Amino acid sequence: MIIVLLGPPGAGKGTQGELLAARLGIPKIATGDLFRAAVRDSTPLGIEAKKYMDRGDLVPDSVILGILRDAMASAEAAHGAILDGAVRTVPQAEGLAQVLKSIDRKVDAVLLFDANHAELIRRLSSRTTCDICQTPFKAFEPGTACPRNDGGRLIRRKDDEPEAIQNRLSIYEELTAPVVAWYQTHGVPVERIDAIGDVTDVTMRAAEALKHVPRAD
C-alpha cells in the first residue's frame, strides 16, 4: 500500500506517518528527512535544497522527484510506503504518478490531516530543532542540549520563525490544497483526519480510515 500524507505545516504528519508505518509494516519515506541528510552532508542537492528550506519555500519538483524515484525503487519500499512531504503541488502529484507508473505502482490512498491556523502557528512557533540530528522538539528553549544526547544544541529554525510560518501556510493554501481535488478526480480515496487532540487518538482516526482502503500488496 502506498499512502500519501497531506496537511499544512505543523499538522503532525511526520509523527503520524511513523506511527502508521509501524502499524502497517511499511517504511515512512519523508522528503524532509532526505533533504536534511543531504544538508548535513553538504551534498550538491543539500546545498540547493537548503536555500529553499531556509526561506520556507517549496523545493523544486525536479529535486523532489529525483529523490523519490530512488527511494521508491529500493527494496525497502517493495511492499509499499507512507510518503510524507512528497506531494505538495499538483505537478508533484502528476510527477509522482508517473514515477510510480514506471515501476507498476500507484498511490492507494491519501490521508489529509486538518488543523486550524491558530493551532498550527502555536505548534510551530514553540518548536526547536537539534542542530546535529535535526530532530524537532516541543517545549524546549533554544540553546538546550538535545534530549537525544548526541552533543547537539536546540535551535529555532529559520522556517519556524513567525514570518516564515505565515509564508509556509500561505504556500500550502495556494499550492497544496488543490492536490486534494486532483486525487479525488483521479479516483484516489482521500480521507480527512482531525489532527487536533492526543497523538494516539489521531493515529486511531487515521487507522480507522484506512480500514476501507484495499491493500495493493
Predicted region positions:
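Glycine-rich phosphate-binding loop of ATP-dependent small-molecule kinases
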Residues: M1-D217
